[in-house]
Amino acid sequence: MEQVKLPFRADIVGSFLRPERLKKARKDFESGLLSPAALQQIEDEEIEKLIAEQKVVGLQVITDGEFRRSWWHLDFFWGLGGIEKKAVGQGYVFHNLETRPESVKVTGKITGYNHPMIAHFRFIQKLAGQAIPKQTIP
């Protein structure tokens, strides 16, 4: 495939709009209607579709769209050893909208051992083909 030189540059941060199927699956999971394995299966399928679309349009760098995350930063922190998810009194306020009241609490030495995002990266890496897999970390 011939690569076209464009008169501009664009970077993909990594986050794509979540498909309705994935949004529904997350709600069902939070309500206890969907198991962790069933949620992961839906995430995997939607990520596979997204990566295929990125390849079709010729992107050289692909991402999972952050489809497994509910926050771009807190999900990463919650995967570290020595960090716990913490409920707080108020969420972040941005343009008069309040987010979920969640944060982090340091409970011990911080480690990255067995961080779940390593498996997430390996999943997109095996689908990348000739493209470069990209994962956003804070």
Go through the PLM ranges and name each one.
Residues 1-138:
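Domain-level signal for soluble alpha/beta catalytic cores
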